[in-house]
């Protein structure tokens, strides 16, 4: 491997976002660059919408996905994963004083990003009770939360913090209900996805993640984006 191409969503801060000039920034982008440096390969970052992120890997548009993707049994049928590089709890966010009762969510509209672990969790646990509203990106979900079209959004705590709470007007919102980490739905943390035939690349990436943690580079990058230990237990 002389060059490794990483597929990144570019619409999921603090993991990735797109600047006005089209360049990608965020934790996943910094991690990709640091991993390439550690593996002594050239790095190429490819922006890819979430809906097509695994198909585009299989179609060789890039070699690995680093996009806050949870390691789940379902995804493992299609791709291989490195060990985790982050683990984040999942939470609901709503307007302050919305008074949502999590023992009785009947008829409430809850927003998720389509084809995510959050989507699957809601479908399996609340599918017959709530109206699940699915969006192509989190930004669209936030808009509908602000407009009162949905009662709550379910997502990664860090993405909700960055996308809503830390933004202008964020003080009008709060985390509500339980913190969700059940591996059955949310997997074993975020991993880097690689095509099954590229076992050598998965091994290289695993070794590089370990090395970045041992050298303290991982912690330096993480501290730019998170004020807690994003690696988890």
Model-derived regions: residue spans:
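Acidic, polar ligand-binding/catalytic clefts
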Residues: 33, 37, 42-104, 171-185
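Short, solvent-exposed loop/turn elements at domain surfaces
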Residues: 13-18, 74, 101, 202
């Amino acid at each position: 491997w002389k060059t490794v191409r990483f597929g990144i969503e570019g619409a999921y801060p603090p993991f990735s976002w797109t600047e006005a000039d089209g360049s990608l920034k965020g934790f996943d982008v910094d991690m990709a660059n640091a991993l390439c440096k550690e593996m002594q390969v050239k790095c190429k970052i490819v922006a890819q919408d979430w809906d097509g992120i695994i198909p585009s890997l299989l179609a060789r548009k890039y070699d690995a996905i680093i996009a806050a993707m949870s390691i789940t049994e379902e995804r493992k049928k299609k791709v291989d994963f490195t060990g985790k590089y982050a683990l984040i709890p999942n939470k609901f966010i709503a307007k302050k004083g919305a008074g949502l009762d999590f023992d009785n969510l009947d008829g409430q509209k809850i927003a998720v990003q389509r084809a995510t672990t959050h989507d699957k969790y809601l479908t399996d646990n609340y599918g017959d009770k709530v109206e699940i509203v699915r969006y192509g990106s989190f930004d669209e979900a936030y808009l509908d939360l602000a407009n009162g079209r949905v009662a709550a959004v379910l997502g990664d705590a860090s993405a909700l913090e960055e996308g809503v709470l830390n933004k202008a007007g964020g003080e009008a919102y709060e985390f509500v209900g339980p913190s969700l980490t059940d591996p059955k739905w949310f997997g074993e943390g975020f991993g880097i996805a690689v095509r099954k035939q590229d076992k050598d690349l998965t091994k290289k990436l695993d070794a590089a993640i370990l090395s970045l943690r041992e050298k303290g580079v991982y912690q330096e990058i993480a501290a730019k984006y998170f004020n807690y230990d994003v690696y988890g237990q």
